[in-house]
Amino acid sequence: MAKEIKFDMESRDLLKKGVDALANAVKVTLGPKGRNVILSKTYGAPHITKDGVSVAKEIELECPFENMGAQLVKEVASKTNDDAGDGTTTATILAQSIIGVGLKNVTAGANPMDLKRGIDKAVKAVVTHIAGMAKEVGDDFQKIEHVAKISANGDENIGSLIAEAMRKVKKEGVITVEEAKGTDTTVEVVEGMQFDRGYISPYFVTNTDKMEVQMENPFILIYDKKISVLKEMLPILEQTVQTGKPLLIIAEDIDSEALATLVVNRLRGSLKICAVKAPGFGDRRKAMLEDIAILTGGTVISEETGLKLENATMDMLGTAEKVTVDKDNTTIVNGAGNKEGIASRITQIKAQIENTTSDYDREKLQERLAKLAGGVAVLYVGAASEVEMKEKKDRVEDALSATRAAIEEGTVPGGGTAYIRAIAALEGLKGENEDETTGIEIVKRAIEEPLRQIVANAGKEGAVVVQKVKEGKDDFGYNARTDVFENLYSTGVIDPAKVTRVALENAASIAGMFLTTECVIADKKEDNPAAPAMPGGMGGMGGMM
């Protein structure tokens, strides 16, 4: 396919048009008085959102050159979302500002490479300043609530629910977001370990109203292979029957013949039993079975370690205070594993989290850690309509990411104030030549933009507010929600330092690429592509009736 090539100013102007198209759509969502954006969907109702990255992801422009500009800034939003989970709109605004002012300077004859060096120098200074300003969150759940509220666009209910979930499961715990059946947004905590495997047969159910298997003080048999014939299990079954306690079997699978025998005995009342499949796949399954064994004080019966099912003894079985199994999940509460064993397993998983490079593996390890250490909280998001539910779920996920970021690197004054305070770090900073110093000035101007935009979205005059905030010190800033200048820490207008840092780093990184671009190549559009030829006739079928 033929290519179209644009050089120099022409290429940069087209890219900038794309940047502005995307950034202008995204930046209206910033701040407590940010506006909604409605996204048309091919199927179903339109999606209403105030989430910057959701807006950015929807944007595709017709002109391939403009589209490239938009896609580059989309990358800023996505990367910031991946790294910090929030701050996508801020990153987009910063990128637009650095690119806009930077291109004017390049057009006026500045050296793009020197500008980029100056920008990088300034960003480094600002990031160091932000780190110095950051205050640790620790176990201050009020701060966590404030961060969550700000990130959820000022929704106090979401803020308090996330703080409650964090309080219940601590830092190690996992918090997941699900859609609720009703209109209320609630938080539920699953104590103990839960994994996503339910009973193999509904005939094991003990509570028919809830369709659940409920067991008090059961023994737990953990086997890493398929149980093909019941004969292998008979010795251990006979021993558990004599104790009169129920038995939970966790195995890779159970053959239909062996399962039928267990079900018949369960229905006769001679066995209190339930069987579930082992969670996970491959190596992760082995690790999860080992976790369950450590939590319940049992042993994984595995031929790899020289143990056979027919030789299993009672001391290889784990125990727990209570086990609940429904059609989808198994929950083990208060396993009888010893505290030292669980603690060393937790340390081991934490070390694996540190060393892994895969985000997917990290997420799965984090889940395993939560199941052993803190428990799992589920935030059920409810709303009157599906459209509202999706919008609310976006905000809850943002708020959750922001609180995690705040716990990691602390908090700074919100509402764009942290950037205004960081201008002080650039005051005496000079580059090695004039263009580098211009690069520093570009960043100095750009970091005012988030506050200007928050103020503009609140319907006020940006320049006046920025000047007044500059005159103040520390956490003195503008609260756009109440239209008051005040100390932002005391009123809970705070942002995670990590989000503030990542937004600027990613914006400057893409902007630097932009300014140093000299040529853009895209596919050439064909004016009138020829219509495809009609398929041939159905010759040779004349004899059919």
Swiss-Prot record:
PANTHER family: 60 KDA HEAT SHOCK PROTEIN, MITOCHONDRIAL
Domain of life: Bacteria
Record: residues binding ATP: T29, L30, G31, P32, K50, D86, G87, T88, T89, T90, G415, D495
First-level EC class: isomerase
Gene: groEL
Identification of the protein by name: Chaperonin GroEL
Keyword set, alphabetical order: ATP-binding, Chaperone, Cytoplasm, Isomerase, Nucleotide-binding
GO CC, one annotated term: cytoplasm
A molecular function (GO) term: unfolded protein binding
A family per Pfam: Cpn60_TCP1
GO annotation, biological process: protein refolding
Subunit note: Forms a cylinder of 14 subunits composed of two heptameric rings stacked back-to-back. Interacts with the co-chaperonin GroES.
Origin species: Porphyromonas gingivalis (strain ATCC 33277 / DSM 20709 / CIP 103683 / JCM 12257 / NCTC 11834 / 2561)
Stored HAMAP family: CH60
Keyword Cytoplasm: yes
Enzyme Commission designation: 5.6.1.7
Substrates-to-products reaction catalysed: ATP + H2O + a folded polypeptide = ADP + phosphate + an unfolded polypeptide
Family of the protein in this entry: Belongs to the chaperonin (HSP60) family.
Entry-linked InterPro entries: Chaperonin_Cpn60_CS, Cpn60/GroEL, Cpn60/GroEL/TCP-1, GroEL-like_apical_dom_sf, GROEL-like_equatorial_sf, TCP-1-like_intermed_sf
Lineage, uppermost ranks: Bacteria, Pseudomonadati, Bacteroidota, Bacteroidia, Bacteroidales
Function: Together with its co-chaperonin GroES, plays an essential role in assisting protein folding. The GroEL-GroES system forms a nano-cage that allows encapsulation of the non-native substrate proteins and provides a physical environment optimized to promote and accelerate protein folding.
